[in-house]
Amino acid sequence: ASYKVTLKLDDGSEAVIDCDEDSFILDVAEEEGIDIPFSCRSGSCSTCAGKIEGGTVDQSEQTFLDDDQMEEGYVLTCVAYPTSDCTILTHQEEEMIG
């Protein structure tokens, strides 16, 4: 299956990508030329963090976020697969760390 992922970028613009259920959101965004920050690419830091505004993802491979952060909607886009159409606010590392 493929899902529409709407990325709300830090400059106020939005980008919509078609992301397969077995593709990481960050990888597809990069292929489309969308600038999302990243560092480790393995779900063990917070550089690529986003916040889900709607829809669902599978980020079971991540090791950085705690349960509270995930309940608040934070997502590591480098290890997140879409499980529905979803909307993600990008560039959320500073907001998340506070």
From Swiss-Prot:
Keywords: 2Fe-2S, Chloroplast, Electron transport, Iron, Iron-sulfur, Metal-binding, Plastid, Transport
Broad class of the protein's primary localization: plastid
Residues covered by the 2Fe-2S ferredoxin-type domain: 3-94
Binding site for [2Fe-2S] cluster: 40, 45, 48, 78
SUPFAM superfamilies membership: 2Fe-2S ferredoxin-like
GO MF annotation: an example: electron transfer activity
Subcellular location: Plastid, Chloroplast
Gene3D superfamilies from the UniProt entry: 3.10.20.30
Superkingdom of the source species: Eukaryota
GO cellular component: chloroplast
Protein's UniProt name: Ferredoxin
Lineage: Eukaryota, Viridiplantae, Chlorophyta, Ulvophyceae, TCBD clade
